[in-house]
Regions:
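The feature captures the beta-strand-to-loop junction immediately N-terminal to the Walker
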Residues: 37-39
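Helix-to-loop junction immediately C-terminal to a conserved catalytic motif
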Residues: 52
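Conserved ABC ATPase "signature" region
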Residues: 92, 96, 103-121
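Conserved ABC ATPase signature
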Residues: 125-132
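ABC ATPase C-loop
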Residues: 143-144
Length: 213
């Protein structure tokens, strides 16, 4: 894992004449979990895609990105799994994509699947998993190659309480390994899991804080 520190200063992203992210300033550092909080259209996904290197700023003074794609783990809002593949085949595909050795992929996937409570369904098609199980598999796939930057778009949406606890165990373990973890959510109670919070609305940063402030 290569540690990732990103500083954005007055970062702006536009789509045509629409400003999706307006003068965003923030820092993201290794070993932390940052929550992007806001409703639909707040700019959370735009910011995640920017940090992932999938978008470019139209203005701003920024450092630390775009991160090499092999050092990024990204889970989109739809879980990011291939539904026509089994759990094991999803893992094999991602492992090959990032050049993991068979031994490394096996050891790492066994560890993550156990933490996610998915170790009993390796041969099940992802399309036949529950929504919560697919979300957990999405986080497993995003963190399989131990990236320095992990980006999760509403990873707990539609997830039952038990699966949510397993998800947070995965996310906390990823940060403890030294990754810079950033997740988007519409739930204020999710903020308690974060090291730092960014409140967004219509692409504008309204406030920055911690769970205790």
């Amino acid at each position: 894992m290569e540690p990732v520190t990103i500083n954005l200063e007055q970062a702006t992203v536009r789509f045509g004449d629409k400003t999706a992210l307006d003068n965003f300033t923030g820092e993201f550092t290794p070993g932390t979990v940052t929550a992007l909080i806001g409703g639909d259209g707040a700019g959370k996904t735009t910011l995640l895609k920017l940090l992932a290197g999938r978008l470019r700023t139209h203005s701003g003074n920024n450092s630390g990105y775009a991160v090499d794609r092999h050092n990024v783990g990204y889970q989109p809002a739809d879980s990011g799994v291939w539904r026509h593949l089994s759990v094991a085949e999803n893992i094999e595909f991602v492992a090959r994509t990032y050049g993991l050795s068979p031994d490394k992929a096996r050891t790492r996937s066994e560890e993550l699947l156990t933490k996610a409570g998915l170790d009993h369904v390796p041969n099940r098609l992802a399309g036949r998993l529950s929504g919560g199980m697919r979300q957990k598999l999405g986080v497993v796939l995003a963190t399989l190659h131990q990236p320095g930057l992990v980006l999760l778009d509403e990873p707990t949406t539609g997830v039952d309480p038990i699966s949510r606890a397993e998800l947070w165990s995965l996310i906390a373990a990823t940060a403890a390994e030294g990754a810079t973890v950033i997740f988007a959510t519409t739930y204020l109670d999710e903020a308690e899991r974060a090291t730092r919070l960014f409140l967004l609305d219509h692409g504008t940063l309204l406030g920055v804080g911690t769970p205790t402030k």
